[in-house]
């Protein structure tokens, strides 16, 4: 169910590192694992634009509320253009009557500025209801010659019966019953029941109520806070959306868009903020995520409510919307938060066709608390939000009463606050009878695009004024779009047959998947095409528009005669074996032989390449790595320039042969800088600056720049002062989709992004507090938290873990039992002492344990050491952590006995010493008592022995040999430099170690150890100091975040950021350095090792050869590619991965030939299994191996090769600090580096290719 309300498509996060289809539910909110078996075919399609996401669009600004409805025109009739209609413009005739409304105000309450409760969410299948007696001649299909038709209603003729209210449309809402004021149910115990959801929500029809006055709502409970909310007519803020693309999307148990109710939660964190809670959730979504957060000022929706979230346990998650109340601390803020929550809850109930029905006392209803879910449904044991509400002298019954009142107001059943009467319900909806047309302005423009009508749609409209559309079977086909029309807040496309031009009708924007298209061009080109490839009657055609399939065996010749670009894809029309049709260029291979291009001489125009020059209005930043500045585009080489990472104006664009150039100049003067190659700049379109006269507020410390979209090299100064300062803007320019303003603040002038500016709020009148006193909520001042350095083992029998020492009841701590953790904090509370346990990497807090549940020892400071040891025959194994238990062993004692252990650091634990180092390609801790320092042995010539390890060739000037130590049979390593070398034998000859193994071309050879490296590390100079980049990050509007205690996110300090960005420090850590691992570089991990890791992973088992081939073909790190496939397939168990066929547009799982899709490519949310299998079938993926190799190309281009190819670059973007970063958590790259390191450890390998930025 697509919803239209301030929707923004979320930014795609390129990294998919961890997770599986079966993920643990929220540690704090639900402790059992959800069985997603029934939802295996509902995939999270974060790699593609799902069709449901494409239906989302932002609702236009509310138009004026005008009395009346539109005149209905039969959509089946297309009126021909009459002879006297010379212009073809849509005609509007106006007839206006005066409507009157009883304006009496509600008793004991003052009239307020707005008598409506706005609907926060809506979608469109019906024409918008309007409220003016106006008759319009419909805009007809044939009346489309004039692309600028406008219909205006004379505002002087309109006498509004009410103040402005939002015009919105809605569907899938339930028909309201008679006006009721449902009270909370009696507190009686009953047998737990299950709420069932109707298979279909009937459209609700609400006409203007015939009564002249609606009844006031009669509260069912006494509440001073609710009275305060009502008296002051508190308004709920607009719902913000902060969706995260990598959150999983699973249907509710009744299907997508069918929740059965809403659950009230509170965050249980007295010190957090709404931003902190959301940031924490995003970084820990594998444990829990909810739909929305509410505080006193904001409502932020964090996940689409059409899909379930993980917030209330395995039983409740498939049923309910989960919303968290963020703690506030004063009377007014708490009241606003209750108002905001009630408004959001009422909006959800109304939108999904549900009525308020409290489940608190009988386990049956639509409004639940977390406590009620625990009591009646199980799967969780939490009791919120009762404790938090009580702390503010409030109760769930009062909140439910407020939700019920809000709902009835929205449904037009009781009078809105501040008024006694109304003639229309506040929720605009489908009118019961046709009346007058929309009063919105009509604009029509030419369009040259294509569209596919969705299966669920509002129908075809003969005119854009029609109340309803006519049902159509022309769905999931590609049509040409020739016109775009906007009427009020509705947008329509005029669709027509692509080949004949026959018009079908108007469709609503939300009912189609639309793509831009360029005009077709004639071509004359031959390609090769594989047999079985589908040809289509139209470009971007669907399964309903197949013209035929390529016959024959072996590649066939496709002769293309026409080409068209749809969005960013190229389609060609041509003939093959007597069949003609369209096909994507991705399925064609150019058979033309490449023609060598003559090398142009410097400053001499080439005679073979055509030069085209055109004017351009844009801006560009020259990359740090570039080909220099060119005086003319004919120059062979450019001149080096220091003008990098600065913003310049672009005035010209030139194309010469296969190269494209931009002419850059100083933004503020006529000075030309020179020509630069397109690939050497980051370019953005720019509109011409316009003069403005506007005052804003800006925070102190905000940077001003000498140019719009300026860099750190173009800072004009920073805003001084304390508190918000006044910024007087005089000029504005749009760069790409961002707005920049030039102005002055405190004597300094410069450009600043509009995102950092705020319009000054109008002064508000003080509102008197209600007389009802609120009891003081006091807490005994706790003792000071002490920082300690200790280590602890959790006892098998323990009382559990707490998020805070103030929690009276601990959560189950069984999963931490008999394991060792670092201890960083200690605090006494009452008569008990608690310590904060951190994970094995020191820096991620897990929670607080009572010291009675632990065995604690002092932990010394880690000291570097470089020493080789022999592991004793009797030993305790290699552990993840010093003093680790049997549950934390990486390699058992038998696996490392008498092996060589290379130590790099040591630490004392109590009276023992533990050393950290490497053995058998694995790193971990060994007790010093289990090690013996070997005596020095003089190197001697030895016989060749088996040795399995993959090195990297580091010396391109070295040689490989047929036999070791041969001076004659040797060959250059230049062609194999920086490539893997899989060693199988080792031999020492005269003190020189030789390795025998396989080169990347499959040839076996001997190579000296001095020409090999265990890893290849490259260092890149950033041109900046660590202080500079840390200052940029710390100065961002959305500050980097740090978590010092569990669940509490705070703005990171400058030193936190600098510490997290310190590449020298990170590179020294064996696990943290994996944030520099290149994800776009395969490293030839052996097929046997991959297969061993994939054992038990469903259809991915024994697919090591396919992953190896895919990594080599498309340049992707094997570990990253495997992790992506495991996530998408639920460890190889999803139906999409196991395979199926699509026959007659239906999924068949028992067919002889099955098609597989292991990366979820094209598995659109509206029907992921069918769409994903269709894509796989079209691609010919009839084996799992083909799906792995074929899908890897998409993964490589869409994720790894998007530019930021390491975790460090994804988090900090050292090339452009502060822009396009994937997280705010300063520890994000560290966490994911350890996860990837963990995969390597499980496979028994180590990373080979690292790219480390260096600061001056």
UniProtKB/Swiss-Prot annotation:
Domain of life the protein comes from: Bacteria
Family, per entry: In the N-terminal section; belongs to the N-acetylmuramoyl-L-alanine amidase 2 family.
Name of the protein: Bifunctional autolysin
Catalysed reaction equations from the record: Hydrolyzes the link between N-acetylmuramoyl residues and L-amino acid residues in certain cell-wall glycopeptides; an N(4)-(oligosaccharide-(1->3)-[oligosaccharide-(1->6)]-beta-D-Man-(1->4)-beta-D-GlcNAc-(1->4)-alpha-D-GlcNAc)-L-asparaginyl-[protein] + H2O = an oligosaccharide-(1->3)-[oligosaccharide-(1->6)]-beta-D-Man-(1->4)-D-GlcNAc + N(4)-(N-acetyl-beta-D-glucosaminyl)-L-asparaginyl-[protein]
Function: Endohydrolysis of the di-N-acetylchitobiosyl unit in high-mannose glycopeptides and glycoproteins containing the -[(Man)5(GlcNAc)2]-Asn structure. One N-acetyl-D-glucosamine residue remains attached to the protein; the rest of the oligosaccharide is released intact. Cleaves the peptidoglycan connecting the daughter cells at the end of the cell division cycle, resulting in the separation of the two newly divided cells. Acts as an autolysin in penicillin-induced lysis.
Region (Disordered): 103-151, 172-214, 419-440
PTM summary: Undergoes proteolytic processing to generate the two extracellular lytic enzymes, probably at the septal region on the cell surface.
Signal peptide bounds: 1-29
Swiss-Prot/TrEMBL keywords: Cell wall biogenesis/degradation, Hydrolase, Multifunctional enzyme, Repeat, Secreted, Signal
Major place of residence: secreted
Enzyme category, top tier: hydrolase
UniProt domain GW: residue ranges: 443-517, 519-593, 612-686, 688-762, 784-859, 861-936, 943-1017
GO biological process: cell wall organization; peptidoglycan catabolic process
Organism: Staphylococcus aureus (strain NCTC 8325 / PS 47)
Subunit structure: Oligomer; forms a ring structure at the cell surface which is important for efficient partitioning of daughter cells after cell division.
GO molecular function terms listed in the Swiss-Prot or TrEMBL record: amidase activity; mannosyl-glycoprotein endo-beta-N-acetylglucosaminidase activity; N-acetylmuramoyl-L-alanine amidase activity
Compositional bias annotation for Low complexity: 172-196, 421-439
Pfam families linked: Amidase_2, Glucosaminidase, GW
Record-linked PROSITE patterns: GW
InterPro entries linked: Amidase/PGRP_sf (IPR036505), Amidase_domain (IPR002502), GW_dom (IPR025987), GW_dom_sf (IPR038200), MGlyc_endo_b_GlcNAc-like_dom (IPR002901)
Region listing for N-acetylmuramoyl-L-alanine amidase, in residue ranges: 199-775
GO cellular component, one term: extracellular region
């Amino acid at each position: 169910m697509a919803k239209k309300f301030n929707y923004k498509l979320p930014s795609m996060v390129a990294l998919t590192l961890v997770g599986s289809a079966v993920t643990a539910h929220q540690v704090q909110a639900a402790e059992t694992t959800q069985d997603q078996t029934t939802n295996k075919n509902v995939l999270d399609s974060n790699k593609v634009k799902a069709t449901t996401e494409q239906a989302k669009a932002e609702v236009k600004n509310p138009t004026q509320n005008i009395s009346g409805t539109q005149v209905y025109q039969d959509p089946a009739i297309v009126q021909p253009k009459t002879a006297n209609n010379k212009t073809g413009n849509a005609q509007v005739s106006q007839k206006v009557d005066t409507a009157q409304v009883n304006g009496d105000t509600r008793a004991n309450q003052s009239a307020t500025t707005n008598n409506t409760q706005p609907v926060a969410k809506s979608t469109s299948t019906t024409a918008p209801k309007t409220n003016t007696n106006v008759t319009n001649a419909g805009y007809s299909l044939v009346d489309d010659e004039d692309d600028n038709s406008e219909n205006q209603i004379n505002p002087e003729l309109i006498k509004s019966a009410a103040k402005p209210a939002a015009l919105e449309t809605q569907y899938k809402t339930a028909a309201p019953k008679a006006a009721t004021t449902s009270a909370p149910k009696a507190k009686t115990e009953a047998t737990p029941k299950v709420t069932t959801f109707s298979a279909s929500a009937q459209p609700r029809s609400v006409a203007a109520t015939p009564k002249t006055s609606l009844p006031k709502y009669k509260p069912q409970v006494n509440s001073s806070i609710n009275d305060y909310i009502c008296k002051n007519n508190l308004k709920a803020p607009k719902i913000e959306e902060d969706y995260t693309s990598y959150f999983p999307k699973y249907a509710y148990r009744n299907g997508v868009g069918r929740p059965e109710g809403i659950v009230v939660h509170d965050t249980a964190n007295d010190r957090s903020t709404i931003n902190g809670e959301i940031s924490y959730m995003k970084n820990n979504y594998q444990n829990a995520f909810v739909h929305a957060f509410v505080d006193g000022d904001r409502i932020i929706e964090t996940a689409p409510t059409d899909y379930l979230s993980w917030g209330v346990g395995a039983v409740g998650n498939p049923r309910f919307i989960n919303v968290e109340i963020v703690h506030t601390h004063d009377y007014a803020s708490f009241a606003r938060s209750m108002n905001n929550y009630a408004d959001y809850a009422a909006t959800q109930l109304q939108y999904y066709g549900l009525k308020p029905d409290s489940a608190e006392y009988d386990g049956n209803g639509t409004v639940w608390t977390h406590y009620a879910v625990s009591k009646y449904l199980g799967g969780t044991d939490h009791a919120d939000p009762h404790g938090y509400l009580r702390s503010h002298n409030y109760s769930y019954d009062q909140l439910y009463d407020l939700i019920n009142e809000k709902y009835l107001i929205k449904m037009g059943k009781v009078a809105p606050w501040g008024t006694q009467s109304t003639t229309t319900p506040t929720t605009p909806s489908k009118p019961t009878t046709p009346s007058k047309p929309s009063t919105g302005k009509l604009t029509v423009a030419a369009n040259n695009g294509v569209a596919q009508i969705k299966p669920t749609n509002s129908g075809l409209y003969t005119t854009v004024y029609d109340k309803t559309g006519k049902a159509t079977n022309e769905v999931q086909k590609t049509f040409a779009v020739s016109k775009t029309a906007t009427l009020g807040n509705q947008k329509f496309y005029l669709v027509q047959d692509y080949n004949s031009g026959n018009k079908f009708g108007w469709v609503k924007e939300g009912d189609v998947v639309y793509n831009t298209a360029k005009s077709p061009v004639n071509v004359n080109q031959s390609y090769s095409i594989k047999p079985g490839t589908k040809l289509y009657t139209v470009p971007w055609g669907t399964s309903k528009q197949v013209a035929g399939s390529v016959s024959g065996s072996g590649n066939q010749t496709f002769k293309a005669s026409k080409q068209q670009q749809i969005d960013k894809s190229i389609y060609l029309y041509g003939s093959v074996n007597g069949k003609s049709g369209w096909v994507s260029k991705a399925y064609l291979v150019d058979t033309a032989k490449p023609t060598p291009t003559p090398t142009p001489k410097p400053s001499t125009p080439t005679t073979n390449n055509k030069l085209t020059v055109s004017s351009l209005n844009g801006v560009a930043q020259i990359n740090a790595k570039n080909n220099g500045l060119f005086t003319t585009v004919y120059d062979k080489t450019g001149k080096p320039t220091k003008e990098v990472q600065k913003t310049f104006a672009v005035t010209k664009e030139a194309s010469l042969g296969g190269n494209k150039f931009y002419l850059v100049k100083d933004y503020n003067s006529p000075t030309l800088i020179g020509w630069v190659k397109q690939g050497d700049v980051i370019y953005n379109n720019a509109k011409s600056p316009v003069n403005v006269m506007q005052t804003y507020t800006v925070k102190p410390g905000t940077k001003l720049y000498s140019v719009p979209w300026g860099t750190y090299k173009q800072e004009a100064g920073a805003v001084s002062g304390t508190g918000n300062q006044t910024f007087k803007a005089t000029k504005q320019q749009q760069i790409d989709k961002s707005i920049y303003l030039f102005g002055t603040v405190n004597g300094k002038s410069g450009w600043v992004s509009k995102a950092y500016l705020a319009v000054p709020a109008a002064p508000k009148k003080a509102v008197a507090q209600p007389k009802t006193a609120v009891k003081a909520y006091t807490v005994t001042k706790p003792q000071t938290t002490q920082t300690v350095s200790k280590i602890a083992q959790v006892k098998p029998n323990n009382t559990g873990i707490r998020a805070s020492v103030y929690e009276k009841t601990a959560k189950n701590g069984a999963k931490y039992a008999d394991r060792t953790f670092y201890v960083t904090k200690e605090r006494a509370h009452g008569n008990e002492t608690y310590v904060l346990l951190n994970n094995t990497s020191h820096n991620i807090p897990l929670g607080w344990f009572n010291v009675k549940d632990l065995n604690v020892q002092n932990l010394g400071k880690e000291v570097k050491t470089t020493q080789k040891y022999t592991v004793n025959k009797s030993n305790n194994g290699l552990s993840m952590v010093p003093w680790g238990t049997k549950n934390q062993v990486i390699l058992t004692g038998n696996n490392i006995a008498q092996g060589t252990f290379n130590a790099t650091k040591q630490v004392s634990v109590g009276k023992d010493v533990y050393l950290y180092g490497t053995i058998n390609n694995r790193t971990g801790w060994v007790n010093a008592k289990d090690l013996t320092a070997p005596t020095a042995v003089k190197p001697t010539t030895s016989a060749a022995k088996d040795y399995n390890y993959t090195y990297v060739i580091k010396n391109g000037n070295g040689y490989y040999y047929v036999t070791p130590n041969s001076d004659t049979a040797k060959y250059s390593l230049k062609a194999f430099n920086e490539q893997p070398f899989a060693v199988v034998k080792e031999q020492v000859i005269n003190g020189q170690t030789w390795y025998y193994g396989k080169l990347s071309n499959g040839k076996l050879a001997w190579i000296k150890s001095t020409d090999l490296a265990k890893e290849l590390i490259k260092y890149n100079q950033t041109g900046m100091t660590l202080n500079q980049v840390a200052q940029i990050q710390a100065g961002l509007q959305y500050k980097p975040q740090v978590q010092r205690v569990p669940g509490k996110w705070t703005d990171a300090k400058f030193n936190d950021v600098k510490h997290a960005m310190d590449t020298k420090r990170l590179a020294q850590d064996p696990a943290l350095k994996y944030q520099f691992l290149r994800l776009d570089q395969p490293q030839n991990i052996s097929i046997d090792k991959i297969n061993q890791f994939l054992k038990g992973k469903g259809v991915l088992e024994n697919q090591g050869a396919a992953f190896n081939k895919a990594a080599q073909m498309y340049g992707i790190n094997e570990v990253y590619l495997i992790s992506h496939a495991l996530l998408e397939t639920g460890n190889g168990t999803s139906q999409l991965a196991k395979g199926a066929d699509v026959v007659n547009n239906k999924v068949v799982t028992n067919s002889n030939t099955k098609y597989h899709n292991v990366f979820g490519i094209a598995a659109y949310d509206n029907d992921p299994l069918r769409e994903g299998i269709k894509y796989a079938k079209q691609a010919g993926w009839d084996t799992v191996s083909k799906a792995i190799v074929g899908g890897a190309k998409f993964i490589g281009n869409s994720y790894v090769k998007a530019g930021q190819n390491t975790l460090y670059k994804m988090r900090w973007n050292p090339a452009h600090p502060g822009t396009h970063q994937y997280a705010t958590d300063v520890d994000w790259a560290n966490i994911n580096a350890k996860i990837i390191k963990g995969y390597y450890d499980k496979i028994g390998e180590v990373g080979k290719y690292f790219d480390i930025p260096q600061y001056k």
